[in-house]
């Protein structure tokens, strides 16, 4: 049970009508400092939701039944189609909010909702509700394209134009008065919101231009617009740059004192050829006792970025560096990342080192985590090391000084890889796109990014260091920030198990308690099979997102009990924090007040860093989609073979060899009626038996690509690749209209849907905005009842209440069936 459920359950069953906060905390064993803070915060939340009251004497009691409302606070997550979901907390399933029931909430807003329909674990349906109040707006600025009104419209309205938001989840136009900055038509601008949509003006917002970012035809403006729309800023404040400039370019002798000296080790960096921020170096050797020594040396960024300094505050705000196709938005100024904190060859550099003694079985026997100094022997690239591993004589001769070290590293890498496989780590080996752009930022080539042994080897060493550092802090019971990856949720995993069964793949175990080794064995079984890419992707989608936390929940994907991020403090704030914790409390001899300080601070840092990471990933994906669509604009009309990557009721997404994905809309499949088989994730033609299912090869033609939306449309082309389901075709007899009956699947007519309100059913390129389909994807099958289920019982039993008005005049919506 969640904390809120525990509190409510105790009060409902208590012999006392009211208890003091202290009595309640002691009774629930939540009176220790760490738990008490969360306990009090939960009480405040329950009071705000009218589930608890505080008496005149400050005691806690349940709200009177007639006063109790099923009102919950949460974060609204909008869908571009107009509906959304409210996230309550990590332990509770999301609540579906239909289009028209959002009270004009925007994506990210904190809201109060009332529950209209409880979740049904047996049917696998989510709870449904409606927004009753917006507590706090999350969106304060909008970035988009300015569209000027003509002179007549300006005179009639007193407005100069409107801005179309780059964010698809903000469907409203933002109108501008003749104040502040006046942009030219089609300019890309940033607008401060001054008025949000409401009942009087339900389809519009109003604002003032605070920045003219550029013109639509400026070079690189497309990427800049995406970054600006997500509040990702390249420029650093002056005080931050000033602090960076004050950092010396060389390491003075007095800063070496007290550090472990690894300058005599054969230590080198291995990075991409175009990398400039070289923040990690490695050394490896075989010991006389038969074990291996692996040293992972990371730039000591925390030595220069001190706590609460301008550099630190800016790094915290950014959270992470953002990597898009043609640029990097760094977390720290280049003066640091490419200068004193870059482990350039043959130069003294301050580091934090994790040096491990590892057995031939891959077990860490001993380790030392220390402040250190190194002087790297070489600056190596992945390509050069891969050539050495492949036995290239020229490469081996050019880098003879490190050749023995590389050989030992390869041995150790294979040992560590085998160790992780034995314990159940899952290797998804996902395929990434490499987008090549010209000097104008235009995409000229897109191909799969390759990973050789060198790339895997460095990743393997970084994993080992991260795990060792986390294990150290866990063993000493110190406050820490962990990188956690929780076990998959049962409902999502069950959908994958069902899906794999359609490929004839049986997965042992149950969705409630599956072991990593089972999934690892499954990945090994599908290796090299036709459906490998699709099945691997679907399994990855069934996993939870990794995140940062002050609580150690382990890492499911790595099958690791302890894990953190230690190896990239130049580009990730949690790594910088880990370095700071090593420096300040890592030895375990720390005053209680310092430990308490970090116990209080780490939860907020973890949550903020997770949010910033998701923002960076969203930006990177958005730019990638845009550049892929821009690339395909030059290939409209061309034909390709691809693989069906996913199937929905409105069509299917096809992935090409170079990772580009496009939609074949259901309305373009002519001459048959197609049934959508949700369990199989397939479309099957009633008359022809023509079948489209995930993993199937298919031939297509590119018919449209839109760089602004990032959407690409394909047209299906009949070919010898097609699959005919003869059994499906034969088992149904035609009715009087010549159609075959089906009670087991959803019938989807292969013509464009008709609607008097086109915007309600389609997006700009004709994609169906089907909220029920999207809702079905969010179904929860957990047997656990939501915490509000008791309060919800009987709330809507009075049929006379159906017409009850809210304070804003809206009628309460009828329950969905």
From Swiss-Prot:
Alphabetical list of CDD domains matching this protein: S1_RNase_R
Enzyme class: hydrolase
EC number: 3.1.13.1
Keyword Cell wall biogenesis/degradation recorded: no
Compartments (UniProt record): Cytoplasm
GO terms under cellular component: cytosol
Disulfide bond entries: none
Region (Disordered): 728-817
Ranges of biased composition (kind: Basic and acidic residues): 767-777, 795-810
Protein origin, superkingdom: Bacteria
The family this protein is said to belong to: Belongs to the RNR ribonuclease family. RNase R subfamily.
PANTHER family registered for this protein in UniProt: DIS3-LIKE EXONUCLEASE 2, RIBONUCLEASE
Name of this protein: Ribonuclease R 1
